[in-house]
Amino acid sequence: MPQQWLPPIYWDGDAVAILDQRLLPQREAVIRCTSPKQVVAAIKNMAIRGAPAVGVAGAMALALGAVLIQAADARTFKSKFARLCRQVRTARPTGRNLGWAVDRIHALVEGNRDADVPRLHELIRREADLILAEDVAGNVAIGSWGKTVIPRGAGIMTYCNAGALATADYGTAVGVIRAAFDADPGIRVFSCETRPFLQGARLTVYELMKAGIPVTLITDNSIGSLMSRGMIDVVVVGADRIAANGDTANKIGTYMAAVLACTHGIPFYVAAPRSTIDASLPDGDGIPIEQRAPKEVTHFNGRRVAPQGAAALNAAFDVTPNKYITGIITEVGILSKPFGRAIRQALKA
């Protein structure tokens, strides 16, 4: 049976409330942010994560910060607001949605030349709310499109967490799973644990169980074995940034899963809103890859598991070349190869 759900981010009066995903699934605790600096900190320390959710958080941080700016006139306000936009934009580098949301609100402010400061406050808050609402509606549409590629009784594998916790609600890849399950409760879902931060084990399994959808947790290094045994029929993952040719940055290990899926003839789909597409990048070579602290690899639950002094690489993302991707599921339809042309058309829709 579905359980009560706490959204990952929402307004709590004049504060931004963020569900602390670092504590899940053991504890549900909310961080109440009263300044944009607190929201940025929550993004950086991964209390909130997932490209669409981070984009929404960035928009809400701007709305929160706008009313704190002391400015006697619109010109002064816009100058200070531009500085705030730069601070929020750089919170995490790989995901496209944060920069997209910040640029969208900044352009709105710059485009309203006759608005006074109170009016600008109103416009910023309204746009942040619209970004949140659009994300949820887009995710539901992604799910509706995505369920059409899921065979009846299929074994679906997903990686990391591209669910309600990674968005404003409902989810992208997990949104496809939700919609597929509603249409066919006979599907089987496999969630990779996703080391080292264990987003699959901690978050995807948590929210699927909350939704009443049966799920089996698997180790990352069992993907090939399960595929070879015919247990996986389709793979659906999310995305943090998609280049103009369809190359896709997602959680580290996605590339490995895509290669294995291709080897075994298994369809591999990326589910993401158009706001994740970065048309300024011709291919995945230009996608910035966030490097996180080695301690996330050398320690587990605060305890060292590697020898003292051991070196560790901890790239948070990798890039899957478009040749391994069967299709990109967006809110306006499923994009097929050649992705360059399909992406250009989707961005015009």
From Swiss-Prot:
It is an enzyme of class 5 (isomerase). The active site is at D240. Its EC number is 5.3.1.23. Catalyzes the interconversion of methylthioribose-1-phosphate (MTR-1-P) into methylthioribulose-1-phosphate (MTRu-1-P). One of its GO terms (biological process) is L-methionine salvage from methylthioadenosine. The keyword Disulfide bond does not apply. It comes from the Bacteria. Substrate binds at R49, G50, A51, R92, Q199, N250, K251. InterPro entries: IF-2B-related, IF-M1Pi, IF_2B-like_C, Initiation_fac_2B_a/b/d, M1Pi_N, NagB/RpiA_transferase-like. The keyword Transport does not apply. Belongs to the eIF-2B alpha/beta/delta subunits family. MtnA subfamily. The record marks C160 as: Transition state stabilizer. NCBIfam families: eIF-2B_rel, PRK05720.1, salvage_mtnA. It catalyses: 5-(methylsulfanyl)-alpha-D-ribose 1-phosphate = 5-(methylsulfanyl)-D-ribulose 1-phosphate. This is Methylthioribose-1-phosphate isomerase. Pathway: Amino-acid biosynthesis; L-methionine biosynthesis via salvage pathway; L-methionine from S-methyl-5-thio-alpha-D-ribose 1-phosphate: step 1/6. Keywords: Amino-acid biosynthesis, Isomerase, Methionine biosynthesis.
